């Protein structure tokens, strides 16, 4: 079992506008540290002494980095922080201090390195604060990272900050038929001595249906294959590549059962259907791989030294 803690706007006294500002500006609000302290104290008490509880995810898919730094709401952007209104002056002043400390005269001369250094500082501040708070109340369970998603998981500064403070780096892994070799090689370097976990992945199949009507399968990040057997083949191939890296400690298939989106359209994410009927052709492939994990680990260990 794992538990997730999140950056929310409950400590602000007003609703935060995700469509105007990057959520990570909330890190610098005067009440944030107190809010996190109360939240961790409350959640950690639920699992005190629980030997079956693995640990905590700090959050889910935080907006550390966006594709090609194109969206300041989905990725930390120095200019975005510098332009924040008075309501978020603490985050703006943090960015202004960064500019002064690095001798950057104006936004017009901000370099790519400046941008990445600032992203790394914000990520470091986040992970240092949150992990220290967790350890204040819970020293027995693991801190499982923040389920990095999209371009955040490909960013060196972000991954390194996570690995510096968390017990492992967790990534939600979509939009690929199999793990990319260059990304896995980067993770081995960026994570250092820390392992990584694939905290979310799945694939959907076109043959899923409810009472004779095929699923819409339009919701979610997982791609689409033809059959449940193909889902099983995807699962085996994906997980074999993870085992081959030798620094992946596991994966979490998302999710247990099929479900509906907000418009009532079904999506084939589960290992069982909406009616809780198991997808046997998918599960047989999953079972075959899962029961072979330890022998496969031995195989890849031996192969790595040959």
Predicted regions span which residues?
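Ligand-binding grooves and catalytic loops that recognize ribose/phosphate and carbohydrate rings
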Residues: 15-47, 187-188, 209-248
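Active-site beta-loop-alpha junctions enriched in small/polar residues
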Residues: 11, 59-63, 148-151, 174, ...
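Glycoside hydrolase catalytic-domain groove-lining segments
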Residues: 108, 117-132, 136-220, 236-240
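Substrate-binding cleft of secreted/luminal carbohydrate-active enzymes
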Residues: 53-54, 60, 199-201, 218-272
């Amino acid at each position: 079992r794992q538990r997730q803690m999140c950056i929310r706007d409950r400590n602000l006294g007003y609703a935060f506008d995700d469509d105007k500002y990057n959520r990570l500006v909330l890190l610098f609000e005067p009440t944030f540290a107190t809010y996190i302290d109360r939240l961790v104290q409350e959640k950690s008490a639920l699992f005190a002494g629980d030997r079956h509880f693995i640990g905590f995810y700090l959050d889910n898919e935080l907006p550390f980095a966006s594709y090609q730094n194109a969206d300041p709401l989905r990725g930390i952007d120095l200019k975005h922080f510098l332009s924040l209104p008075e309501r978020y002056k603490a985050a703006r002043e943090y960015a202004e201090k960064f500019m002064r400390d690095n001798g950057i005269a104006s936004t017009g001369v901000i370099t790519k390195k400046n941008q990445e250094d600032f992203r790394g500082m914000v990520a470091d501040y986040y992970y240092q604060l949150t992990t220290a708070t967790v350890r204040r109340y819970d020293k027995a369970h693991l801190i499982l990272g923040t389920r990095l998603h999209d371009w955040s998981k490909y960013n060196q500064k972000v991954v390194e900050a996570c690995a510096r403070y968390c017990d492992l780096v967790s990534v939600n892994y979509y939009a690929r038929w199999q793990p990319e070799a260059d990304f896995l090689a980067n993770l081995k370097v960026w994570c250092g001595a820390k392992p990584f976990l694939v905290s979310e992945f799945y694939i959907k199949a076109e043959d899923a249906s409810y009472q004779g009507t095929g699923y819409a399968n339009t919701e979610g990040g997982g791609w689409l294959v033809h059959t449940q057997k193909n889902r099983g083949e995807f699962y085996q191939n994906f997980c074999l590549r993870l085992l081959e890296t030798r620094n992946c400690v596991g994966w979490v298939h998302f999710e247990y059962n099929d479900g509906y989106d907000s418009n009532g359209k079904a999506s084939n994410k589960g290992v069982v259907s909406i009616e809780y009927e198991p997808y046997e052709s998918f599960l047989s492939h999953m079972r075959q791989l899962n029961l072979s994990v330890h022998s496969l680990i031995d195989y890849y260990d031996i192969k790595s030294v040959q």
